[in-house]
């Protein structure tokens, strides 16, 4: 059932409801018929430069759905960094706490995408790794007044941990995406996560279990739940996602409709950004309903090339989602 009317905005208009503490990457994308083997040079048929980075991707998707957003991040004092700040502004994202540094280049992601929409990616985090706790403290006011705070692991883990700690202290709902995953993740990441959302390969790294099906994902999610998260979501690409929580520890599979994927790059970030939007603006929806809607939005994103360029706007989506 569609939520009635516009979201209730009881807070002041200029306050960001969704704050993302995370990464900005310039995507350097090559489209090829297939992925190259080790030591092989192959011809691609198209190259383009786009905007990516898990943090900014998630923020852009939330903003395009209508969320008031703020991005806490660090880019280089270079042309990629300048262009990135302009991109955030074009998406109506507050850049008050988008820092620039001379000490490192803006982060980059070299991405190769085949005809099936599968990809391989190498990231060089650059300036992202210089975002520090001092920068977070300068942004404390915007973090403490948010409805939802989102972070990932493309910035220094200690910085993400500090962001989660600050949000939790202020009673702000935390949405943590442990990507890229690290096997020996600090246990505090689990206990500080109201919603812990990862994909199947990240779940494998974090738990040591094989995740090849929804049933496997349910078992891995249980392991993660026992580490102290309130809610665990494991996304399964075209198979949707699996969810469980402290209050409903029985794994539930939320399937998604089948679509023809053109480019799956950034689909997980579209999902997280959509989920952040629903958590902030429609907190009374059931979790299952939020996940169905987030699945739908992520499925729209894989039907176009590029990362943020494939993310839908509210005006392009069915009214039943809002």
Curated annotation (Swiss-Prot):
NCBIfam families the UniProt entry points to: D_ribokin_bact
Residues noted as binding K(+) in the record, renumbered to the chain: 263, 265, 301, 304, 306, 310
Pathway where it operates: Carbohydrate metabolism; D-ribose degradation; D-ribose 5-phosphate from beta-D-ribopyranose: step 2/2
Activity modulation: Activated by a monovalent cation that binds near, but not in, the active site. The most likely occupant of the site in vivo is potassium. Ion binding induces a conformational change that may alter substrate affinity. Competitively inhibited by phosphonoacetic acid, etidronate, 2-carboxethylphosphonic acid, N-(phosphonomethyl)glycine, N-(phosphonomethyl)iminodiacetic acid and clodronate.
Note on how the cofactor is bound: Requires a divalent cation, most likely magnesium in vivo, as an electrophilic catalyst to aid phosphoryl group transfer. It is the chelate of the metal and the nucleotide that is the actual substrate.
Subunit structure: Homodimer.
Root EC class: transferase
Active-site annotation: 269
Species this chain originates from: Homo sapiens (Human)
Family stated for the protein in its record: Belongs to the carbohydrate kinase PfkB family. Ribokinase subfamily.
Gene: RBKS
InterPro entries noted in UniProt: Carboh/pur_kinase_PfkB_CS, PfkB_dom, Ribo/fructo_kinase, Ribokinase, Ribokinase-like
One cellular component (GO) term of this entry: nucleus
Catalysed reaction, written as an equation: D-ribose + ATP = D-ribose 5-phosphate + ADP + H(+)
Protein name per the record: Ribokinase
